[in-house]
Structures are given as structure tokens and as C-alpha cells.
Amino acid sequence: MHQLVLNKATKFAVAVLLTVFGNIYAADDIGGVYEQSGTPGSITRTTGEELTAQIDTGIQSYDNVETENGRLKIKFVDETQISLTEHTLVEITEYVFDPDPSKSKMAMNFVAGTARFATGGLGLVPKENIVIETPTATIGIRGTDFTTTVDELGRSLVILLPDANCDDKVKLEEGCRPSGSITVTNAGGVVTLEEAFQAVMVSTFETAPTNPVVLVDLDLNQIDNMFIISKPEEIIQAEEEQQEALKGDGGLLDFTDLD
């Protein structure tokens, strides 16, 4: 259910945070666009109002944010950030911000395209109160930085990224630490990602995620909508192994194998 809680104390706290971030938005805004390149996308409100997604455009709860031939980054009042590549659609389905962090919540639906999610460093929204959904899975946050690519069929590729101390291109032998951990869950099972560049593919909501694999020599600039079409070899192998397991079990996969 959509929900937004902004009492007087909360609105004051939001205004203070937005001032600190260097951008002043409307009282109901929960963040705003702070980077944009290429063709501007759009922000659609529940009222039907459509805004151009350009720098300093405010973001409100329940907004649908969609890019065209361009990219943008959004920063929320708790410093959570999402980065959208071309032709990406994200729905902000819930944002409850309260001066008491335990009462704050965030939920988003990554509908299509490629989005990178990084939780805020202020701890204003507890990670356990953040939920990201795709058409085929629910992502529980116990980490801070990951990407999701969703194709036109809803298939989702989820990658846990390293911590902020790693460069854009990092070789695993350099000892890159993960940004935390995330769970990927659907009707077929649950998988936990807890290594830098660890990834899973989720084909349908009823089919369990593939076994986690580590993507070697990954350049973060490669992660866009083509990444799910031209899949990494590690993901292709994981999908083939899953198909073989399904055949061997007569279509029933033993989820204990995913631990």
C-alpha cells in the first residue's frame, strides 16, 4: 500500500537535510535529480502531472521515474542514491521518513532497464526497512550498493557491488570487499549475495534464482540494458546448470542446493 508520513517534525527534518545537500525542493519532496545527461526523461505524479527529469527537479513518493536516451541520478533525503541508465523505469512505491529511523521505510519497483541502488550513509532509513522489487524477485537490503537489470520479459540480473573504496574497474585478486549483502527472493526460493561482483539471474517469479556466481574483471560501465542480452559467461553457465538440475529433478529444483 502506498504510504507517506510527513508530520511537522519530519517536514522540518527533511527541509534541513535538503538544505545540507545544497538543494531546496518543495515541502513534499523526498529528494531530487542531481545529475542528468542525454535526452531528459520524465517524472509522472499520481495526479497525472508529468515533469521533465532535469537537475533539481524534486522527487515525491509514488512518482514514476523514466529515462529515454539519457541517464540520471536521484538523491533522497537520507542520501540513498539511485542511478538510471537509458530506457529505465522505476516506481517509488513507498517512502516513510521519520526522525525516528526505526519508523522510516523505503520501497521501490524496478520495472525495466538498469538501475543502481546505493543506500544512504546517514542511517536514516534502516536497511531492513528497504525493499526493492522487480517483476521476478524481491531484493532485501543488507548491503549498500547493487545493480539490477530488467528486460522486457521481466527477467532480472542482480549484481552486488564492492564497497566505495574500489575503483570502477577492480580485479578480484586485489581483495575488493563487498558493500554488504542482499537477498534475492521469489516463489522459487531465496539466494544471498555476499561477495563483491556476485550475481544471480531470475527468469520468472516461480523459478528460483540461479546459483550465485562471481563476475570476474567486471567494468561497472558495462552494466546497462545490453548486459542482460549479452550475458556474462558466468551467468550463462549458471543458467545452463539450473536447466540441467530442473531436467534431472523432473522440473522440481532442490532449493537446498542454493545454500
Regions found by a protein language model. Give the residues of each.
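Flexible, membrane-facing loop/turn or short amphipathic-helix motifs
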Residues: 43-48, 76, 120-123
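Short N-terminal segments immediately surrounding and downstream of signal-peptide cleavage
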Residues: 27-45
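C-terminal interaction modules
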Residues: 1-29, 50-54, 68, 85, ...
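Short, solvent-exposed loop/turn positions at domain surfaces
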Residues: 53, 59-61, 78, 126, ...
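Glycine-centered tight beta-turn/hairpin loop motif at sheet-sheet or coil-to-beta transitions
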Residues: 46-48, 77-79, 136, 188
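N-terminal post-signal-peptidase region of extra-cytosolic proteins
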Residues: 46-62, 66-71
